[in-house]
Amino acid sequence: MHDSPPFKVIIVGAGVTGLTLAHCLVKAGIDYALLDKGVVAPGFGTTITLQPHGCRILHQLGCLDAVLAKCDVMGGASCRDPNGKIFTSNDFFGVVRKFAGYDTRTLDRQVFLHELYELLPDKSKVYEKARVEEIIEENSTTRVILADGREFAGDLVVGADGVHSKVREIMWDKANAAHPGMITVEEKRAMVTQYNAIVMASSPVPGISAHDMEVTSNDNYSFLLLCQPDWISIIVHSKLPDDQQCTWPTRRRYTETDMEELVSKIIERPVTGSVVFGELWKRRLKAQMISLEEGVLSHWTFGRIALAGDAVHKVTPNSALGGNTAMEDAVVIANTLHALLAMHPNKKPSDVEVRDAMREKYQNTRVDRARAIVKAGGDLTRQQAYDGWKAYIKQRWLTPIIGLDTLAQKIAGLCVTAPKLAYVDFDERRGILGWQDTLAAEKERESKTQVKVPIKQKKGLSWSTWNGGFEAIVPQILVLWAGLWLAICFFHLVFSGNHVPGFGSEVARFFTVYNETWMHS
């Protein structure tokens, strides 16, 4: 009899989620194939911001030093009004680092993906120009059929293929075919588009600090600048008119003409007290206009298919949590599979075991956190764009009162509750808050070491066996003796006036007075 092939994961999408998952599976010793419809590390897109929990994951994977070498530290943050005047500022990223333990870093997305790819130990597992056409589940396996006719067989398919996921559509069809109505219209329309954005990078402009974040609020749009010594990342968030807002399956695509039209309306607007947007636009290195979807789906898995990253949750860029949340998904999927396979070292898990593990250990542990992150990001986008009078009051007047330190601490609080790989030991960096999973594990270990160890009985007859159980009633006997002694003492004092051994003269005088009063009454 031939041994069955090892458990294998087919990852669809070689973006942040897919490449992170590939590294996680390498650490777990789980086989995989990574497919992408295009090429790895494409030129579109501008930047990714790695929050402390993203850096912690990279630290576990052994990728952190290589990534940090490609970018510089972030410094302070300033919030500005439509005229570019500062109304609040602080050492934002220093506060985040102090509370969470790791830096926040911004770098070119293409550079980041290239580093993750180059650090993979076996690049032959990565397939470019591999467009998925169909997924077939049969006999406890899955077959991924590509548009060019190639097939890849495995035990689990992970759709990490972005907000317009092909794997998600296939999973929806399979779910509704097996259980009509399982995937509702409400869920399919859960991701909404109410904003678009110009995402671009420019060379440095005199007057803008090399390490800071600048947020300049306007009426229904905002400028977000993340600055590095050699370039500046710029995102212009714009609220769409009601008649242009949409949900799935509508996909807004913008042309160069669309982007130029928007730029013409904002080119003279201040981004700082000394720089207007046109100066950044003139120095642009690359730019594109995109839709900003936001939302969280309810079903993350069905059968032997699971969704991750933007395919299942999408957050606006203001909070810089989207890519980090996708990395969290990769970690939890890998943890789930590592634990599941450890239960069956000599055989593969069944369909039911795979399905239940992915639902209970992955989906059910992730969905609430994803919703909280998406809401936080959406609220911040609207607040910074003065989207309504409440948002204006919060950003312009309450933020200076509350202080950016509070926002930085909240970001750090989200970071330290993120997961890490359960099977990779490393010397993590800690901030004031500490990593919650690590603290919980330490507390559990301490509680185990404090458990009283039962006293081993000596061989032969012991006092407890010899006395016939007499020791079990010793406490009751002692209480009875103490009560009897007190009664005798009280009787003795009342009627004789003598002292009770161990008590001072004040007690004797008290009982003498009591005696005389009682006897002559």
From Swiss-Prot:
Positions bearing carbohydrate: 139, 220, 515
Compartments, record wording: Membrane
Pathway(s) per entry: Polyketide biosynthesis
Pfam families per the UniProt record, alphabetical: FAD_binding_3 (PF01494)
SUPFAM superfamilies, sorted: FAD/NAD(P)-binding domain
Induction or repression: Expression correlates with the production of depudecin with high levels on oat grain medium, and minimal levels on oat flower medium and complete medium.
Domain of life: Eukaryota
E.C. number(s) listed in UniProt: 1.-.-.-
Coiled coil (UniProt feature): none
Signal peptide (from-to): 1-22
Binding-site residues, FAD: 36, 109, 310, 323
Keywords associated with the record: FAD, Flavoprotein, Glycoprotein, Membrane, Monooxygenase, Oxidoreductase, Signal, Transmembrane, Transmembrane helix
InterPro entries, sorted: FAD-bd, FAD/NAD-bd_sf, FAD_mOase_fung
Function: Part of the gene cluster that mediates the biosynthesis of depudecin, a highly oxidized eleven-carbon linear polyketide that acts as a histone deacetylase (HDAC) inhibitor and makes a small contribution to pathogenesis. The reducing polyketide synthase DEP5 is the central enzyme in depudecin biosynthesis by yielding the backbone polyketide chain. The monooxygenases DEP2 and DEP4, as well as the uncharacterized protein DEP1, then act as tailoring enzymes to modify the intermediate polyketide chain into depudecin.
Family named by the database record: Belongs to the paxM FAD-dependent monooxygenase family.
The protein's name in its UniProt record: FAD-dependent monooxygenase DEP2
Gene: DEP2
